[in-house]
């Protein structure tokens, strides 16, 4: 007798390429809906509802009261101080954050891991402690002879301290993934070090730099704890908007405080949106040129 070999496709038709595959584990519509629902609820409770509440409170006195709150001399001066110092701090951290990230990725030296861990210290340190540290180092009894208490430079140093990690941590992963062969090829063609950096490395780092700058700027304009002691809230000099908000709350003007908060939120959102768009275009250009 001739042995008949069973056709495996007849026994298990799902092995045939003509049979559409079933849903992958964890991708069912019910599971997806559950995940999306949980994410939406959590995002609403933690972010959206508080933002809606502060917007509602800022409109409690009507448009006229809102405008009076944000256009008063004290408010305008606090905006000026906040934006000026925050912009300066962002530029400083862009430069030195890039240098630090470069050193941590491209150079080897004793204590490298310790330095890398110290970068995250401002994230873990309570901001009021950061202000106390700044006061101890740069206050009237400064052990190094730098008396920055109640000066804009003191506020600048404090904000630079708490925002530096944003740039470093944004740039580091991109530097680690950069293809060194492209740099070596440019060098073999006679390109100088600065030319290689500006034409090969910097375009690849631009999206990360913009992302870090946006986060650093947004953190700086809303910072309170790190500047409260070293700055001293001198009107028109060191009083940032967050300190003016505290003054309004202490004077039982919660509507005015909410109005100032909305302006800061709007500025932060617009800056992040613009930098995200610019960074996205830069990333696309980099992909097309690769």
Where are these regions (language model features)?
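Short, Lys/Arg-enriched, Gly/Pro-containing loop segments at transmembrane-helix junctions
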Residues: 182, 281-290
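Membrane-water interface segments at the C-terminal ends of transmembrane alpha-helices
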Residues: 28-62, 69-176, 200, 204-225, ...
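Glycine-rich helix-loop "coupling/hinge" segments at transmembrane-helix boundaries
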Residues: 226-252, 289-290
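The alpha-helix within a helix-turn-helix
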Residues: 186
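Glycine/proline-centered hinge or cleavage motifs at structural transition points of membrane proteins
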Residues: 189-190, 203
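Short, Lys/Arg-rich, polar N-terminal cytosolic tail immediately upstream
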Residues: 2-29
């Amino acid at each position: 007798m001739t042995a008949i070999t069973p056709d495996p496709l007849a026994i298990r038709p799902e092995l045939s390429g003509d049979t559409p595959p079933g849903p992958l584990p964890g991708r069912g519509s019910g599971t997806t809906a559950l995940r999306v629902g949980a994410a939406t609820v959590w995002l609403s409770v933690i972010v959206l509802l508080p933002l809606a509440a502060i917007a509602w409170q800022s409109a409690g006195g009507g448009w006229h009261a809102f405008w009076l709150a944000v256009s008063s001399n004290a408010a305008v001066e606090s905006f000026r101080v906040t934006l000026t110092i925050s912009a300066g701090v962002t530029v400083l951290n862009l430069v030195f954050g890039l240098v630090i990230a470069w050193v941590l990725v491209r150079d080897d030296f004793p204590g490298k891991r310790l330095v890398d861990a110290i970068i995250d210290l401002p994230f873990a340190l309570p901001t009021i402690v950061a202000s106390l540290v700044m006061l101890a180092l740069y206050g009237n009894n400064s052990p190094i002879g730098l008396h920055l208490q109640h000066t804009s430079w003191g506020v600048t140093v404090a904000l630079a301290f708490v925002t530096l990690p944003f740039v470093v941590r944004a740039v580091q992963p991109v530097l680690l993934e950069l293809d060194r062969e492209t740099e070596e090829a440019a060098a073999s063609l006679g390109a100088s070090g600065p030319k290689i950096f500006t034409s090969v490395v910097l375009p690849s780092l631009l999206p990360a730099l913009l992302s870090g700058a946006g986060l650093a700027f947004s953190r700086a304009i809303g910072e309170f704890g790190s500047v409260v002691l070293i700055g001293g809230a001198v009107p028109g000099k060191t009083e940032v908007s967050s300190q003016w908000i505290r003054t309004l709350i202490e004077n039982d003007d919660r509507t005015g405080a909410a109005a100032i908060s909305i302006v800061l939120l709007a500025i932060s959102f617009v800056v992040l949106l613009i930098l995200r768009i610019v960074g996205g275009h830069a990333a696309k250009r980099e992909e097309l040129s690769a």
